[in-house]
Amino acid sequence: MLIFTDPRFFVWLWEMEDEIHQCCPIVYWHVWDNDPYPDFNNVLYDSNDLINCLSYKTYGLVKPHFPDKTNYIPHALPTDIYYPLPKDAIERAKIQLLGEKRKDHFTGFWINRNARRKMPNDVLVSWKLFLDELQKKHGHRNATLVMHTDPLDQEGPNLLRTTEHLGISDSIFFSTDRLEFEKINVLHNIADFCLNMACNEGFGLGTLESMQCGKPIIALKTGGLTRQVVNCHDGSENGVALDPDCRDLVGSQNVPYIYEDHVANEK
């Protein structure tokens, strides 16, 4: 039996591991968001015959505690789903989506759920600071941030009100529909970069998708994002790697402790 991602989804299954093991082994494709090692998960890890970690951060946390059954199986994407489009196709798509007036805009892309952990309000504040600096240095605000998310998601802030408060509504484009892979690929291609400022992130699919489209990323060095934004072989950056400015230990009843990493908006 193959299970994957957040262990909280499968507590019910591990509770009947004895019955399952009479029929088949349990293989867990696992990701954990950040330090420290979650020893409260030990009883869950014990129940698996194999733990395959999709991020190197997760592998580094789990391997020392379960060395005989922990492997690193990095996340990957099919090259026929996310890939660079021809320049003329990108230009047409950008006009079709953003309009003629924004065809030459510097364009950023943020693709995440609107949830607190993803720090969407911090993204908007940072974008405002960037626009202000653009106006100051170059005399214009010709930049657009595309946010593929639900601005009214109950798990996050009201992003429509935030953009109004910051005075940047004209510089934000919300993509709210559920889209097939082909259209998500277009969104990645019309952008100049992809941004992820999540305070802890097990992996970060959006940034991997963007790099596969040939785009640089801006990412906080936290969780699985670190291995994406910093080349582990030569230390070069695949865009801009942001060092955390502070780290908070937070938690809940289900996850008693985990670190959140934060970066100053001014960066």
Where are these regions (language model features)?
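Nucleotide-activated donor-binding/catalytic signature segment of Leloir-type glycosyltransferases, i.e.
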Residues: E19, G156-E182
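Carbohydrate-associated surface elements
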Residues: K57, A76
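A short helix/loop element that forms part of the nucleotide-sugar donor recognition site in Leloir-type
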Residues: Y83-K101
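Aromatic "clamp/platform" in nucleotide-sugar-dependent glycosyltransferases that forms part
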Residues: C199
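Short hydrophobic beta-strand element within catalytic cores of glycosyltransferases
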Residues: P216-A219, T226-V230, E237-V240
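Conserved donor-binding/catalytic core segment of Leloir-type glycosyltransferases
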Residues: G99-K118, L124-W127, L145
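Short alpha-helical donor nucleotide-sugar binding micro-motif in glycosyltransferases
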Residues: Y45, V186-A191
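Glycosyltransferase donor-sugar binding loop
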Residues: G139-L159, D177
